[in-house]
Regions:
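Short, charged/polar N-terminal "headpieces" of proteins
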Residues: 1-46, 108-111
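Short, surface-exposed, charged amphipathic helix/loop patches that serve as local interaction elements
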Residues: 33-111
Length: 111
């Protein structure tokens, strides 16, 4: 009668809360480890193009791409609106990836 939701053994799921002064936002990560690897490689390439001479629009586009890669389009946009500063978004996304998500992706790939 009811179909069980099939969960890929390579899926990555997480919940993360970000704080900014007196505000908080909770975002959810759900996706396939392999697709994260591909998306994060593209994000890394975009991040490497940012220099001190990059204009604000380039920084915003890069930060938005990184956030969308990690959290999906809607939640990535919410994170951009939450911080309203591209370098802050790049920083928190980088810290989250380094501290938690990379370990979850590696674990999912070993299954």
């Amino acid at each position: 009668m009811f179909k069980k939701k099939e969960i890929s053994p390579y899926s990555v799921e997480d919940k993360v809360t970000f704080r900014n002064v007196d505000k908080t936002i909770t975002l959810y990560v759900r996706g396939d480890a392999a697709s994260y690897v591909v998306g994060l490689k593209k994000a890394q390439d975009k991040l490497s193009e940012i220099t001190g001479e990059s204009n604000e629009q380039e920084r915003v586009e890069c930060a938005r791409f990184f956030a969308r890669t990690l959290f999906g389009d809607d939640q990535g946009d919410q994170l951009m609106d939450f911080y309203n500063e591209p370098l802050a978004v790049i920083t928190v996304c980088g810290m989250y990836f380094k501290d938690r998500l990379s370990k979850k992706i590696t674990k999912a790939q070993k299954r």
